[in-house]
Amino acid sequence: NWGYPSRALRTKDFLYIKNFRPERWPAGDPCAINNKGELEAMHSAYHDIDACPSWDFIVSNRDDREIYPYFLKAAGKRPYEELYDISSDPGCLHNLVGNGKCTEKLTNLRKEMDKLLKKTKDTRYLDNPAQDDIWETYPRLSGAIRTFPAPLF
């Protein structure tokens, strides 16, 4: 039931993403706990992806080497930072963080992101750690609370 906090900055040629909680599942937890308190099957949840035949196919065939990359892109955990050259990689398939050729671009986009978060008083801004998890403290106003296994961290 936790959110997946991330912020993104896009320029003409690049997309920079900062994932503030990379230990979380961006598509929701992979399995849930049912009403009897029993752990459901792995890959039976991902409640932040709407049910549809294409997702059912990807989950059912995730062990296929050709399908697995799509499964990871849809449901896999993300690194703390992502950088994509959207002019040459519009599908954002190749994360350039760690690519020595993009160090200067990454540094500049980090600075721009920090300036923007500070200017907009974003609660995820690093200078305000007391507000970092404020979103986790608000009560849920509608809908059932689902139960998931405790995180392993």
PLM features: residue spans?
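C-terminal cap/loop subdomain of S1 sulfatases and analogous C-terminal strand-loop tails that border
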Residues: 1-82
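Long, internal low-complexity/basic segments
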Residues: 59-81, 86-153
